Amino acid sequence: MSNNPNNSGQPNKTQSILQEVDKVKDVMHNNIGLMLNNHDKASNLQDKTASMSNNARLFKKQTVTIRRQMWCRNMKLQLIIIAVVILVLAVILIPIIMKFV
């Protein structure tokens, strides 16, 4: 019976196949673990992206508000400067005009 080619390699072949199955199982377990880890990272990245998007929207809204406020302040300052210049010119020119009239 030991000379029969069909039976002589069966235990080694079965053991070899079982070892390969174990290796494939280990690889699949590692792949599943990596996949779950990548899923968690992608989920965290998605949360951070949503948060950054909200922050960007808020930042844009605040900058528009501040830009309007600064424009109004600038206009007020320019009007005050123009009024002061007109007042100074009036103070200087009115006495001169009154002398010649």
Swiss-Prot record:
<dbReference type="GO" id="GO:0031201">
    <property type="term" value="C:SNARE complex"/>
</dbReference>
<feature type="transmembrane region" description="Helical; Anchor for type IV membrane protein">
    <location>
        <begin position="77"/>
        <end position="97"/>
    </location>
</feature>
<feature type="topological domain" description="Cytoplasmic">
    <location>
        <begin position="1"/>
        <end position="76"/>
    </location>
</feature>
<feature type="domain" description="v-SNARE coiled-coil homology">
    <location>
        <begin position="13"/>
        <end position="73"/>
    </location>
</feature>
<dbReference type="GO" id="GO:0030658">
    <property type="term" value="C:transport vesicle membrane"/>
</dbReference>
<comment type="similarity">
    <text>Belongs to the synaptobrevin family.</text>
</comment>
<dbReference type="GO" id="GO:0019905">
    <property type="term" value="F:syntaxin binding"/>
</dbReference>
<feature type="topological domain" description="Vesicular">
    <location>
        <begin position="98"/>
        <end position="101"/>
    </location>
</feature>
<keyword id="KW-0472">Membrane</keyword>
<keyword id="KW-1133">Transmembrane helix</keyword>
<dbReference type="GO" id="GO:0005886">
    <property type="term" value="C:plasma membrane"/>
</dbReference>
<dbReference type="InterPro" id="IPR016444">
    <property type="entry name" value="Synaptobrevin/VAMP"/>
</dbReference>
<keyword id="KW-0812">Transmembrane</keyword>
<dbReference type="GO" id="GO:0005484">
    <property type="term" value="F:SNAP receptor activity"/>
</dbReference>
<dbReference type="InterPro" id="IPR042855">
    <property type="entry name" value="V_SNARE_CC"/>
</dbReference>
<dbReference type="InterPro" id="IPR001388">
    <property type="entry name" value="Synaptobrevin-like"/>
</dbReference>
<dbReference type="GO" id="GO:0006906">
    <property type="term" value="P:vesicle fusion"/>
</dbReference>
<keyword id="KW-0968">Cytoplasmic vesicle</keyword>
<dbReference type="GO" id="GO:0006971">
    <property type="term" value="P:hypotonic response"/>
</dbReference>
<dbReference type="Pfam" id="PF00957">
    <property type="entry name" value="Synaptobrevin"/>
</dbReference>
<protein>
    <recommendedName>
        <fullName>Synaptobrevin-B</fullName>
    </recommendedName>
</protein>
<keyword id="KW-0175">Coiled coil</keyword>
<comment type="function">
    <text>Involved in the targeting and/or fusion of transport vesicles to their target membrane.</text>
</comment>
